[in-house]
């Protein structure tokens, strides 16, 4: 039995739910794993990696009647495709990025024994009620939908506030992430511009736009291309002025960058 078969069993009764389970505060318990590209920024990924890397070094332990078997599973190979280090790293990463991490049990064929644990990363999940019992219904990005009894899953969360089951989004970081993106874009644009515009030339007469473009290309080809190996630039009297643009290094606002870094590392 593969992991896909475990999460999407064909013979199990499909859970048909018409409405969400309503919590005491009337908040609909659902969450989505889209968080505005939080993991796609180098600074935030670095902070998350540092945390996840430290978590991956931990040694999980289990107490209770199932201790011997589950301890062996957790300490060596929680599931068929992950050892303990990878399992803990992925779990910590999911928790940092989405503030909610779901641990689903893997059962044997007759569902009498837990044979593994897997960190789920659905595109969205919701707590629903069916026959007076809570279920966790989840959907993956490929459209596959599954459901499991809520009391069989483990849920880790942080920034735990409105929802009785899931953590809050990372909306509190949106302003910092926007500043980080703006600074990165500004740095990239400045570097590209300083690397492409090297000379400014002024022609001493009115020229049609198409002729101006042709003259610019001719001037560049003659003086600025690899064909000119002499190091000497020559131009005729039609040019009133030719000036070299000094290429200056783009300097990052160190105070602003330090503030952004502090916000990111304090958050994570």
Stretches with model-predicted labels:
Residues 1-253, 257-259, 263-266:
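Structured, contiguous alpha/beta core segments that scaffold functional sites
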